[in-house]
């Protein structure tokens, strides 16, 4: 009996036992080989991810220190999904979502499903039910650290419950992964940072909830606040750096910087200036900026104001940047060469 007949017999047996479509040849499956994506709301980050945004049907982890922009980035992704007609859900385990801020970022609150569960099991059960429905495009869990196991809630303050949250996350992700892929729903887990005690070499930082999420996530984003943006003496925003520490769909370790303005979110105009200058679309001479031989302003903040008031110019600059996305990724968003790369690679 030759191999072809043996294989056909095995395939027939598998389909009889588990149903048609349980096994197929990848090229003939009819499934799109290109992964569908949803924009992050940041042009630079979309380019750095290598596929034009965050992937659908996958697990994504966004982690970083406090007040670094984790929830802001997740809400921008929700807003972008809603613009395309997607249905989004937000599981607010921290009980800290600000609806007014979400609206300012472009989130349609009337269509956003929100849950504020009491226990971690309840939160993940709700997530599982929503994903299995097949009707959700983006599901955000904010945050993993706030998913408290019921046994810990019912216990006394100060009781030691080692590893319970890690076991909860591990079991939940085992159940969720297949459903997420089938329903083509993107699940974004927001996570916090903790310090490991007694680490002599490498980074002492780690994320909460054990190691399961590091393995199951297709994309992991490390977001950090690297400076303040001031107008005279008043702080009006943060300079933010995002590093792609894990990416199963494109080369990882790209990093990008952008501005997060208070009450506004990611500054698109600021990104257009920075990416435009580095890509050669916007010319900078001293403090003057010009595009297509036309001066558009003196000083970065003035140019941001000009682009907000002239969406046609901003649109042309964005189109030119997107057209050269491949070159830009190589030229300006090169792999970072920080000493922690080895640590990140090991954790990823």
Curated annotation (Swiss-Prot):
<feature type="binding site">
    <location>
        <begin position="64"/>
        <end position="71"/>
    </location>
    <ligand>
        <name>ATP</name>
    </ligand>
</feature>
<dbReference type="GO" id="GO:0005524">
    <property type="term" value="F:ATP binding"/>
</dbReference>
<dbReference type="Pfam" id="PF21096">
    <property type="entry name" value="RecA_C"/>
</dbReference>
<dbReference type="InterPro" id="IPR020588">
    <property type="entry name" value="RecA_ATP-bd"/>
</dbReference>
<dbReference type="GO" id="GO:0003697">
    <property type="term" value="F:single-stranded DNA binding"/>
</dbReference>
<dbReference type="InterPro" id="IPR049261">
    <property type="entry name" value="RecA-like_C"/>
</dbReference>
<dbReference type="GO" id="GO:0005829">
    <property type="term" value="C:cytosol"/>
</dbReference>
<dbReference type="InterPro" id="IPR027417">
    <property type="entry name" value="P-loop_NTPase"/>
</dbReference>
<dbReference type="Pfam" id="PF00154">
    <property type="entry name" value="RecA"/>
</dbReference>
<keyword id="KW-0067">ATP-binding</keyword>
<dbReference type="GO" id="GO:0016887">
    <property type="term" value="F:ATP hydrolysis activity"/>
</dbReference>
<dbReference type="InterPro" id="IPR020584">
    <property type="entry name" value="DNA_recomb/repair_RecA_CS"/>
</dbReference>
<keyword id="KW-0963">Cytoplasm</keyword>
<dbReference type="InterPro" id="IPR049428">
    <property type="entry name" value="RecA-like_N"/>
</dbReference>
<keyword id="KW-0227">DNA damage</keyword>
<dbReference type="GO" id="GO:0006281">
    <property type="term" value="P:DNA repair"/>
</dbReference>
<dbReference type="GO" id="GO:0006310">
    <property type="term" value="P:DNA recombination"/>
</dbReference>
<keyword id="KW-0233">DNA recombination</keyword>
<dbReference type="GO" id="GO:0003684">
    <property type="term" value="F:damaged DNA binding"/>
</dbReference>
<dbReference type="GO" id="GO:0140664">
    <property type="term" value="F:ATP-dependent DNA damage sensor activity"/>
</dbReference>
<protein>
    <recommendedName>
        <fullName>Protein RecA</fullName>
    </recommendedName>
</protein>
<dbReference type="InterPro" id="IPR013765">
    <property type="entry name" value="DNA_recomb/repair_RecA"/>
</dbReference>
<dbReference type="InterPro" id="IPR023400">
    <property type="entry name" value="RecA_C_sf"/>
</dbReference>
<dbReference type="GO" id="GO:0009432">
    <property type="term" value="P:SOS response"/>
</dbReference>
<keyword id="KW-0234">DNA repair</keyword>
<keyword id="KW-0238">DNA-binding</keyword>
<dbReference type="InterPro" id="IPR003593">
    <property type="entry name" value="AAA+_ATPase"/>
</dbReference>
<dbReference type="InterPro" id="IPR020587">
    <property type="entry name" value="RecA_monomer-monomer_interface"/>
</dbReference>
<keyword id="KW-0742">SOS response</keyword>
<keyword id="KW-0547">Nucleotide-binding</keyword>
<comment type="function">
    <text>Can catalyze the hydrolysis of ATP in the presence of single-stranded DNA, the ATP-dependent uptake of single-stranded DNA by duplex DNA, and the ATP-dependent hybridization of homologous single-stranded DNAs. It interacts with LexA causing its activation and leading to its autocatalytic cleavage.</text>
</comment>
<comment type="similarity">
    <text>Belongs to the RecA family.</text>
</comment>
